[in-house]
Amino acid sequence: MEIWHVSDARLRRTRDFGVTRLEDFCFQFNYIQPRVGYCRVPLKAWCSNQGKFAAQFTLKSCEKSGQEKVITSFTAYDKTVKKAVSKLVEEAVDFIIWRATYLERNV
């Protein structure tokens, strides 16, 4: 098995497949504008059995000092770009809602 991970160098950015919904949630809860990317998974990679495509997104907040703070990162795999990105968006939105509830914010 080849050691492989999603990196910014390989990612193509997209705003399709529900990403605008994620943008709305990020704006609503004061997170940095999301940058969702996707790439093809190499056949010999450890995660190739998860899907042909990987979608990636890092959730960041903006501190009062203006510095970005990484909250968490998401990676989703599936057979098509659309399915991988859609799955990623659903997972990220669910997490944002859960975190808002956990932090006792109004949803």
UniProtKB/Swiss-Prot annotation:
It comes from the Viruses. Belongs to the coronaviruses ns12.7 protein family. This is Non-structural protein of 12.7 kDa. It comes from Rat coronavirus (strain 681).
